[in-house]
Structures are given as structure tokens and as C-alpha cells.
Swiss-Prot record:
It is an enzyme of class 2 (transferase). PROSITE patterns: PROTEIN_KINASE_ATP, PROTEIN_KINASE_DOM, PROTEIN_KINASE_ST. It catalyses: L-seryl-[protein] + ATP = O-phospho-L-seryl-[protein] + ADP + H(+); L-threonyl-[protein] + ATP = O-phospho-L-threonyl-[protein] + ADP + H(+). ATP binds at residues 462-470, 485. One of its GO terms (cellular component) is nucleus. This is Serine/threonine-protein kinase tousled-like 1. It is found in: Nucleus. Residues 456-734 form the Protein kinase domain. Its main location: nucleus. It comes from Mus musculus.
Length: 766
């Protein structure tokens, strides 16, 4: 077992005479360092100064004399004062009383340096003992030891040198060992510091000891060292492998980064080329559309500005195509009048039949005789026109057949002219729409193909509303066409009105963004251009809306209309199955897009600006409050939306069911069921919808009774009697491959006739 300390070896008692009476340069230097040492703070401790001044003057004198003797001995002189003699006389007793704090250098393992120091110290101790024996009588006569005059905190009667830290006393402190019993109080002042108050005080360091016991042998240590070396080699090898792998990965990253930069550059070139080609194509389309519009201005007509008093209005003037059709129609009418006149003349030349041949002659003769009697003369001076020569019966029938054929031909020509006129009217509607679009596009600030949000390249204007413009755009990131709706606020609006409009648009964006259904137009993105302009990016559809189709074709077949209604109801069912449910509230033909532009294709619902969210807070048993009364399209809203009272009316998804019925009626008959030729203001003033208690069906075109019954269920006046969206989705009329065969309730499914169902069946019969 080995005990180590930082202060040196402490196996034996220290030799006080080595410090006090043996004049060595090391001891003198140690004394000077002790006297001149200052604590880390840089000034002597106040407690040591107070204790020094509180000493007896005699004790202070003895202490000074003792350390003066040490300094004198270190210079090598042989003379000493009486105080130094006294100190050397008490050398042995001081050494024995020092205890475990002495130096253990006498007990250390023999080394060349230590042997020399011990031999020199031994010779000095012998000389010192001779001096002590020669002066023993004078010192021993006093009867007191110098340690009796000191009270040191480390123990009564101990030598002042014992308070000196071992690191100062022992010159071999860095190579010595100590026992576990050696300890130094860190805060105990030393007598040296007390004796010299004007010098800095040494701050002793706190010592720590560690006792270690082991049974390791050299073989085990060698094995451990070998194992550690092997582990170290493995770790170094692993580190080298990882460094090489890291270098490889860094090289791969650099290669991939270069490749990525190359692809990015190539992608940017492709995007730039795509933009260039799209702009060229759009420019050519704009030029061709304007050329075609100029040609159609002469053929179909154009707008002219007409002054009425102090104001100017635009008036439509038909082109030569309509003028030619009008002339042809006038010629047909004139030909018809001529044929009718000739038919009347032919009737006068109709030959008499055999039974009636005498009667007309007798009558004529009687008239002639009467005329002569009145005139009084038989010779008439006036030339009378000859009576038309009567035709034979064959000639009469021949002429009559010719006139009938001519009338039939004129009727056919008139029908063709009417059909051509209707076709030209449809083309004229497109032409008028294109003229307005071109005019709006020329006045738009986005006409020069800008790229919005560094992503959407605007191509051409699709349409314009009250406060918004819709452009066909190309998404450069997703490489697809899109419809960008640009909302522009009026700069003269108050900030409150702008905030309300923006809040309304953000609400529409939040509602529409969460919807994902094949029958609903998708909303891709939303961003702002400035404080007064923001955009929404929607799915682009090639075709027109249902309203434009109805204006072009007036109506459609029942199969086509039923297909459109089925898709609308499917989308409404989705809106009512999500949480929270949504009421569209603005269903109309203008908000139903025909993907292919025909009635036999897919449809998509758009425009959720007036939608209502049926959350738990606002929706109750009777529905939710209508907070935006007066908004919407009046022809397609139910009667409960027009009720005025102290409290707002309650609405539910049955509002959309009413709209479906109106749209279905308009598709079948080409007109609206209520307020067809009225404006919204007239509908509101005359309470047209509030009076719409029952729907009336025209005689033509012919529509099935099942379709009429379906419309009645949708247009029930009381909302309690009206179907909701879920009931409407399960209506037998909309179920696929099912038709009503007769009024008894038979159903045909895929060509098979089903048996009549009892009244208690789940299938509703009408």
C-alpha cells in the first residue's frame, strides 16, 4: 500500500535544527519566501496582523530573534547571538514535539541526491550537538523552552515552524511522499505570518489524498496495455475508414450538387423556353381572335355609340349576314302573299260542276235584266271587262297543285331561314362576348403576359366580373394550365369596406381550400400582389358554363339534364357529409362549369363566395340564421330566404335542393319556373318567389311524369315538405339504370322489369 501527498514524505519527524541552525542556501531561500509570500489577494490577512500586535513584546522579540538567527545561519557565519543559541538548545525537544507534520525525507528510498543530503544533514546535526553540549548549561539554567512562549492553533507548545506548510520546508516536496495522517488546516494562520505583519501572508493550499489498493501484476498490466493498443489500432483503422467514406460521400455530394446545379440550369432554360413559346402562342391567338372579330363585325354586327340627349349609349347594329337573312325572309313572305292572291283568282276561275252549272247562269241573267231595267237602255256605253275565262276541271286542279307545292317550298325555305337566323344569333352571342372580352383585355393592366408570384404566367383574359378578372394562366412549377382570379379592390373604398371584402375572400379561400371532390373545382393557391389586389388560383376547365350553353341552345334533352342534376346532387352530398357541412347557397347555371362544353359530359361546381358553414355553434334543429339576406341570385333561392321579420330566417341545405329544382326545370323547358322575364328588383318588389306556391309545367316540350314529380319534390313551398340533400341523393329518379314504367310503381332496371313494391317498401313511389 502506498500513500502519496503533494507535500512530500512524512514518515519521520522533521529536523528543526536544519531550518534554524543549519545554514543552507535552501533554508534561507525558504525563509525569505515565507516572509515575503503574499496571499492571492495581494495584501496580508487582517486576522494575522491583529494576532501579531496582540502578542507579548517579549514573545515578539524572541520570534524576531529566532528568524534573524535563521537568516544569519544561511549566510555562512560562525557567530550566533544568544537567542540563536537558545533556539539550537531546544532543537531536539522541538523535533520530537512536531509529530506527523515533519519531513519524511530521512525515511525515503535511497537515491544519489537524497543520500548526499542526508549525509550532509547528519554531519551538521553532529556539529550542532557539540555546540549544544557546550552551551547546555547556560540554556538549561532558564528552565523554560521557547515553545512555552507560543500558543499555536495546531497544538499547545508546538514549534512555530510546524505552521509552515510542508511545501516550503522541504526542498524535495515534488519528489517526496506523505502518510495519510498528515494534514494541514487551510485557514490556520502560521506564526511566521504573525511574527511579520508587514509581509504578505501565505495562503496554504488544501491538500487531497487518495488511497489506492490494487492487485495488478506486470503481466496483467502488459495484457491491458496490449488490449488497449489493439483497441486503439482498431479505432484508428475505423477512423481512417470513416474518414475515407466521408471523403467519398463529400465527393459524391459535390458531384450530385454539380449535377443538381446542371439540372436546375437546364430546368430554368426549359421554363424560359416554355414561357417564350407560350407567350408567342398567346400573342398569335390574340391576333387571330382580333382579326376574326373584325371580320365578324361586318358579318354579324358591331356596337355603335348613339347620343341620346346629353348621354351616349351603345347600340347594336346587325351585319350583312342578318340583313341578307331578313331580305330572304321578306322575299319569302312576298312570295307567299303572291301565291295566296293567285289562289284566290284561281278560285274564281274554278269550273262549275254538273249539278251547279244552271244555277249560276240563271242568276247572272237575272242580274243583267235588272241592270238594264234600271239604266233604261240595253246599249251600255261603258266597256266592261271580260269575265275570266273559266278553266276546265283538270286545269284548275293542276294550278291548285302548283300553288300548294310553291307554298310548301316557301315554308321549307322559311324554316331554313329561321334555323340559320337562330344559328347566327348563337354566333352573334359569341361574337358579342368576344368583343367585350377583347375590350376588357385591352383595358386590363395584366394584358402583357406578366408572371405572378414568380410562378403563374398569364396568357389571356377569360372573363371579367364586378371586382375581379379571370385569366387563363400556366403554372410553371406544376406544368399545367390554371385559372387565376385577380381580385381588385376599388381604391376609393373606405378601409372598412376593403377589409370586409378581403375577409370575405379569405373566408371563401378557407372553405374552398379544404374541398376535394371530382365534381368541385379545385383551389390550388392564394397570394397577394399588393394591399388592394390578391389572387386565387383555380382548376382550369376548357368548356363554358351551363348558363352560356342554355343561352346558345335554349334547352336540352331530359337525359342530358338528368345527368347534370345527378352530378350536382353528388357534389352536394359530399358538401353535407364533411365536417362541418357546407351550404353552397349560390347554385345557378353560371356556377356550373361544363368540362367539355357539352351537356353530355362532366360538370364542376365553382364559386363558394356565399357559402355557409353549418358548424355546431350556428346550426340548430331549425337550421342556421341567414345573416346575408339579400345576397344571391333571386331566381334560384327558396321562399324562406325572402321572409322579413324581427329575426333572420332559418336556412338549411334545403336551399340548395330548391336551386337544383329550378336548374332542372330550366334545362328541360328553356325558361325559369318563377320570374322568368323579371329582373331581380322586380322579383323583390313583387314578392314573386313568396307567391310561388306551386310550379306550373308547360305543355311542350314533353317531359316524363317522373321528372315532373322530382321537380315538385325539389320546389315544395314549405321547407318542411321539401327534401333535404341526403333524401334527394337517394331519390329513385336519380338512381342509376332505373326508370319508372307506369304509374303503378313498376321499375325497369337494365332492361329487366321489377315487380311492384308494396307501399311499405323503402322505395318511394309517386
Amino acid at each position: 500500500m502506498s500513500v502519496q501527498s503533494s507535500s512530500g514524505s512524512l514518515e519521520g519527524p522533521p529536523s528543526w535544527s536544519r531550518l534554524s541552525t543549519s545554514p543552507t542556501p535552501g533554508s534561507a531561500a525558504a525563509a525569505r519566501s515565507l516572509l515575503n509570500h503574499t496571499p492571492p489577494s495581494g495584501r496580508p490577512r487582517e486576522g494575522a496582523m491583529d494576532e501579531l500586535h496582540s502578542l507579548d513584546p517579549r514573545r515578539q522579540e524572541l520570534l524576531e530573534a529566532r528568524f534573524t538567527g535563521v537568516a544569519t545561519g544561511s549566510t555562512g557565519s560562525t557567530g550566533s547571538c544568544s537567542v540563536g543559541a537558545k533556539a539550537s538548545t531546544n532543537n531536539e525537544s522541538s523535533n520530537h514535539s512536531f509529530g506527523s507534520l515533519g519531513s519524511l525525507s530521512d525515511k525515503e528510498s535511497e537515491t544519489p541526491e537524497k543520500k548526499q543530503s542526508e549525509s550532509s544533514r547528519g554531519r551538521k546535526r553532529k556539529a550542532e550537538s557539540q555546540n549544544e553540549s557546550s552551551q547546555g548549561k547556560s540554556i538549561g539554567g532558564r528552565g523554560h523552552k521557547i515553545s512555552d512562549y507560543f500558543e499555536y492553533q495546531g497544538g499547545n507548545g508546538s514549534s512555530p515552524v510546524r505552521g509552515i506548510p510542508p511545501a516550503i520546508r522541504s526542498p524535495q516536496n515534488s519528489h517526496s511522499h506523505s502518510t495519510p495522517s498528515s494534514s494541514v488546516r487551510p485557514n490556520s494562520p502560521s506564526p511566521t505570518a504573525l511574527a511579520f505583519g508587514d509581509h504578505p501572508v501565505v495562503q496554504p493550499k488544501q491538500l487531497s489524498f487518495k488511497i489506492t489498493q490494487t492487485d495488478l501484476t506486470m503481466l496483467k498490466l502488459a495484457a491491458l496495455e496490449s488490449t488497449k493498443n489493439q483497441d486503439l489500432e482498431k479505432k484508428e483503422g475505423r477512423i481512417d475508414d470513416l474518414l475515407r467514406a466521408n471523403c467519398d460521400l463529400r465527393r459524391q455530394i459535390d458531384d450530385q450538387q454539380k449535377l443538381l446545379e446542371k439540372y436546375k440550369e437546364r430546368l430554368n432554360k426549359c421554363i424560359s423556353m416554355s414561357k417564350k413559346l407560350l407567350i408567342e402562342k398567346s400573342t398569335q391567338e390574340k391576333l387571330s381572335s382580333r382579326e376574326k372579330s373584325m371580320q365578324d363585325r361586318l358579318r354579324l354586327g358591331h356596337f355603335t355609340t348613339v347620343r341620346h340627349g346629353a348621354s351616349f349609349t351603345e347600340q347594336w347594329t346587325d351585319g350583312f349576314a342578318f340583313q341578307n337573312l331578313v331580305k330572304q325572309q321578306e322575299w319569302v313572305n312576298q312570295q307567299r302573299e303572291d301565291i295566296e292572291r293567285q289562289r284566290k283568282l284561281l278560285g274564281k276561275r274554278k269550273p262549275p260542276t254538273a249539278n251547279n252549272s244552271q244555277a249560276p247562269a240563271t242568276n247572272s241573267e237575272a242580274k243583267q235584266r235588272k241592270t238594264k231595267a234600271v239604266n233604261g237602255a240595253e246599249n251600255d256605253p261603258f266597256v266592261r271587262p271580260n269575265l275570266p275565262q273559266l278553266l276546265t276541271l283538270a286545269e284548275y286542279h293542276e294550278q291548285e297543285e302548283i300553288f300548294k307545292l310553291r307554298l310548301g317550298h316557301l315554308k321549307k325555305e322559311e324554316a331554313e331561314i329561321q334555323a340559320e337566323l337562330e344559328r347566327l344569333e348563337r354566333v352573334r352571342n359569341l361574337h358579342i362576348r368576344e368583343l367585350k372580352r377583347i375590350n376588357n383585355e385591352d383595358n386590363s393592366q395584366f394584358k402583357d403576359h406578366p408572371t405572378l408570384n414568380e410562378r403563374y404566367l398569364l396568357l389571356h383574359l377569360l372573363g371579367r366580373g364586378g371586382f375581379s378578372e379571370v385569366y387563363k394562366a400556366f403554372d410553371l412549377y406544376e406544368q399545367r394550365y390554371a385559372a387565376v382570379k385577380i381580385h381588385q379592390l376599388n381604391k376609393s373604398w373606405r378601409d372598412e369596406k376593403k377589409e370586409n371584402y378581403h375577409k370575405h375572400a379569405c373566408r371563401e379561400y378557407r372553405i374552398h381550400k379544404e374541398l376535394d371532390h371530382p365534381r368541385i373545382v379545385k383551389l390550388y393557391d392564394y397570394f397577394s400582389l399588393d394591399t388592394d389586389t390578391f389572387c386565387t388560383v383555380l382548376e382550369y376547365c376548357e368548356g363554358n358554363d351551363l348558363d352560356f350553353y342554355l343561352k346558345q341552345h335554349k334547352l336540352m334533352s331530359e337525359k342530358e339534364a338528368r345527368s347534370i342534376v345527378m352530378q350536382i346532387v353528388n357534389a352536394l352530398r359530399y358538401l353535407n357529409e364533411i365536417k362541418p357541412p357546407i351550404i353552397h347557397y349560390d347554385l345557378k347555371p353560371g356556377n356550373i362549369l361544363l368540362v367539355d362544353g357539352t351537356a353530355c359530359g362532366e360538370i364542376k361546381i365553382t364559386d363558394f363566395g356565399l357559402s355557409k358553414i353549418m358548424d355546431d355553434d350556428s346550426y340548430g334543429v331549425d337550421g342556421m340564421d341567414l345573416t346575408s339576406q339579400g345576397a344571391g341570385t333571386y331566381w334560384y333561392l327558396p321562399p324562406e330566404c325572402f321572409v322579413v321579420g324581427k329575426e333572420p330566417p332559418k336556412i338549411s341545405n334545403k336551399v340548395d335542393v330548391w336551386s337544383v329544382g329550378v336548374i332542372f326545370f330550366q334545362c328541360l323547358y328553356g325558361r325559369k319556373p318563377f320570374g322568368h322575364n323579371q329582373s331581380q328588383q322586380d322579383i323583390l318588389q313583387e314578392n314573386t318567389i313568396l307567391k310561388a306556391t306551386e310550379v306550373q309545367f308547360p305543355v311542350k316540350p314533353v317531359v316524363s311524369s317522373e321528372a315532373k314529380a322530382f321537380i315538385r319534390r325539389c320546389l315544395a313551398y314549405r321547407k318542411e315538405d321539401r327534401f333535404d340533400v341526403h333524401q334527394l341523393a337517394n331519390d329513385p329518379y336519380l338512381l342509376p339504370h332505373m326508370r319508372r314504367s307506369n304509374s303503378s310503381g313498376n321499375l325497369h332496371m337494365s332492361g329487366l322489369t321489377a315487380t311492384p313494391t308494396p307501399p311499405s317498401s323503402s322505395i318511394i313511389t309517386y
